[in-house]
Design a protein with these regions (language model features):
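Residue-level recognition of transmembrane alpha-helices
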Residues: 97-98, 135, 167-168
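Hydrophobic/aromatic residues in alpha-helical transmembrane segments
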Residues: 63-67, 115, 148-149, 198, ...
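Long, hydrophobic alpha-helical segments
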Residues: 51-73
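Aromatic- and glycine-rich beta-strand/loop motifs that create alpha-glucan
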Residues: 1-21
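Terminal transmembrane helical anchor/hairpin motif
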Residues: 40-45, 163-232, 239
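Secretory targeting signals
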Residues: 32-37, 43-46, 58, 100-162, ...
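Alpha-helical transmembrane segments of multipass membrane proteins
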Residues: 11, 114-121, 148-152, 172, ...
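Helix-loop-helix units of permease transmembrane domains in multi-pass membrane transporters
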Residues: 70-100
Length: 239
């Protein structure tokens, strides 16, 4: 685990040397700020549910950008061979890359806590921290899953652009497509499919409901994609 943390620190530091990271941060925070301000009404009941729901859609486009170079860049520059010659195994590399990207996302998300302070100061009759805390937990779980998917896509190619496009396609398929289809096709099958999607499972968190089944879903799904990424790296080692 120590070796993974070392890689994570290196990865996190590399984000702040990239102009793309600052562009992503600016766009994400400006969009969140606009959505919060548009929904905020002083003197009304404090709520961040609408902002949290919009964040999920934003992550479909944001996460692929911050995860596209996690492994694809290493393959393109040839540094993956150097990385794998030191006493590291594939699991160390994958966990380190994941934790580094996840760490950057927490930095990206942290400024939005200012909105909680604003709600606490100006909302009536006060602020209920339960739904807000569960909403943040849900966003963190969704981001973890999306980063693991982005990391997996990055392990399949040497091109960062291809990795980003592939990640967007996968995230669109598991998040937006079922929701859109369920609104167009009225059938029990698509209704059941929609109930199992990422967005549907996340909405429980945004309403203040922490369901064990949803926790298991996000954690296990993230673990599956990390496992698949490890297997891809192992297969590349023997080529």
């Amino acid at each position: 685990m120590t070796r993974s943390i070392t890689i994570a620190r290196r990865e996190l530091g590399s984000y702040f040397c990239s102009p793309i990271a600052y562009v992503v941060m600016a766009v994400f925070l400006l969009t969140c700020g606009f959505l919060f301000w548009d929904d905020f009404q002083p003197g009304q009941i404090a709520a961040m549910r609408n902002l949290f729901d919009w964040m999920v859609w934003m992550l479909v486009w944001t996460i692929p950008v911050i995860s596209m170079g996690l492994l694809a860049q290493e393959f393109a520059t040839g540094t993956i061979e150097t990385l794998m010659t030191v006493p590291l195994n594939e699991t160390d590399v994958v966990l380190g890359k994941f934790l580094g990207s996840f760490g950057f996302f927490t930095v990206l998300l942290a400024p939005t806590l200012l909105y909680v302070v604003v709600l606490a100061l100006f909302s009536v009759p006060g602020i209920d921290l339960g739904p807000i805390a569960s909403g943040y937990l849900g966003i963190i779980l969704v981001a973890g899953l999306f980063i693991s998917i982005g990391l997996f896509c990055s392990s399949l190619t040497r091109s960062q652009v291809v990795a980003a496009v592939a990640a967007v396609a996968v995230l669109f398929t598991v998040t937006i497509a079922p929701w859109w289809i369920s609104g167009k096709i009225e059938s029990d099958f698509w209704l059941n499919v929609c109930n199992q999607t990422v967005f549907k499972r996340y909405t429980d968190f945004s309403r203040g409901v922490i369901d064990t089944g949803n926790l298991v879903f996000f954690i296990c799904s993230t673990a599956v994609f990390l496992f698949l990424t490890v297997k891809v790296l192992e297969s590349r080692r023997w080529k």
